[in-house]
């Protein structure tokens, strides 16, 4: 737990700032800028931000590397390409700890509280008692006393040496919990310790313990643990416009497999990444005043909807991340603190005396806990003037690409500097020595190959295609110019009605629909005044609407209304100038199943040639939605399970899709005093009713049967190939893929199948020095590390999961599919859980890479292949459409989500 300032009731704060919790700006879709999730600063690092000259130099280095790779494509395809990674060797040969099992006996008023933090708090009290019984020395921050270096996990205590305590030693602990303003209950527990022997550290079995041990040593460098990141709150830098940034790192101990030709070797490594967190200097009090001025009558509800559940940062004393759990409108800053030392002193007087701060006495108190889940804390009252919002507004979000982007050359420098700083800290030195862990500060290098860029085919008439050599297109526009002669072959029109508002009718769209031979009927002019108006048309209708605002709410309302009527729609807010009409028309064609550019499946290799190929993408998306009732506001986490399928035969690609919504956790943000029993609004957690990954597995057989019936693939003599791409944002999701191949074998018994887990957010980083392949470029002004070439793939650094047999052959690869000149490219990890002997790993890599060029909204290579990119886009878009819990049947053979 973060120590309190002497004489202070609050975690302290200096001049630090908070962690960004706004939204990530994502790509435009249908002309809408949409935001989701919390900002992680994932591309940033080490202080963030660039001077103009630095950024220009980095961009020029990346552009030069792209040009060098293009000019020497044949050479790159023939030779191994060495790259540096953000992994460092870790030696656990002497690593060990003494394991102590801790049990908890519930005494008077005791309850089993949520999480493990209360257990960790009791374990720390037990250790303090053991230390006190053994020595009278006062604990120091870098003390080498064994009790001071123990790692508490909730279930056990990891000690670097044996504790001076007998088996069965126990203490009775008391915890006070405030159940109301004037009522506190004492809860009594008995904590007992039992020795379970010495354990030698091994990866991957003890990865979580190794990570906890190393994290313990970060307390004097990156002390704040938020999610998977460790933040240095003292690294705060003001960036102007009420923005601040700070440094953060993430680390993970892994066992990997390195391959060199036919030989393989296992290696233990520490994976370390850097990032920059962004936050704001806006106080909670400023937001409260704005909301009160905006709507005095609805002030309480608006404040709860805006602030309850968000992360904030303390203004005074030591910088600390907190989470707002409740707002009490009956307790103002002018109320007495009820602190033991001076219970009649008001919060206004306390902060004036302690920090010489001016506090607004009219605003309600916010009750907060530590945002760091590794710290045990009870709710503490904070005046709104003492807390900073971590949520960024739209103007601040627009600055993040400059503040938080970091390029490979700079990233690798900062990673090395961060590791050197951590290893030099007195606490980390002591921790590593005591537990027998050694970390070597040399980057692990791997080798890979560059896959050839695919040929893309553009329809130009009946059974006619224009060829595009994608290797020739490396600019931001991709191969868009290659679509100028696009003309789809004639096909039956599945849509009976095309509705256009006046904007589209006069925007030259009809001309391009005819020129591209898009299978839609002649348009009918319609006025769409609002999403609430009655729409008489139903299935078999396509609607095109110009939105008046960029607000996501208007977009969602129209999408929801159309989807309930089985209407596929296209919306835009941009002006129909320059090449915008062509781009919109190409997207419309793709939505109804006429892809404007495709790869030839036969060219991916003989594993997929001359037979039907069924490709399925399956993911779980998540979104927070606020549900407004008459007397209540509830935050609901919705999980959207999406399935996207394509039947490919040569150059023919036919789509199909489906989704299901699963309701997750609910948090009550506001409840009217007439309906609620308390004046304190707070979050209430309901038990998650279903695990979304389990629902995906349960729904997968029905979807696969539906797809095979739609494409008529389930005949007795039916043979072909199926590849399942299962998206996984975390390692925990990987396990849910284990039995999906059995479903594929049951539904398509005569088909060859492969199952691939796609991990798009691994912290695995790669950086390439072009001079290692092109020595003649050594004298270049742009020499240094850059992004790996587009198409770079490596089977090195396969991660061994804790529950897997390291000696069982498993295929996997990293693939960097897209050029990146605006930061550090993501390296998607592909774990091949199962594949038929007839499907070669090389062909599977080619197929995956070729599909990275096929996303209809972007005629260029993207980091993710078509099925996974579509599935995530589908989940992101429909996660906000609460009433469309399942897609109507008539919309399923489309790509409506584009």
Curated annotation (Swiss-Prot):
Q: Name where it's found.
A: Cytoplasm
Q: Where is this region: Disordered?
A: 1-52
Where does the Piwi domain lie? 542-883
Cite the record's Gly residues compositional bias ranges.
Answer: 38-50
Q: What is its main location?
A: cytoplasm
Output the superkingdom of the source species. Eukaryota
Job description of the protein:
Involved in RNA-mediated gene silencing (RNAi) of mobile elements and repeats including retroposons SLACS (Spliced Leader Associated Conserved Sequence), TATE (Telomere-Associated Transposable Element) and TAS-like sequences (Telomere Associated Sequence), and a family of 74-nucleotide long tandem repeats, CIR74. Predominantly binds to siRNAs derived from SLACS and TATE transposable elements and to a lesser extent to siRNAs from TAS-like and CIR74 elements.
- For this entry, the protein name equals Protein argonaute 1
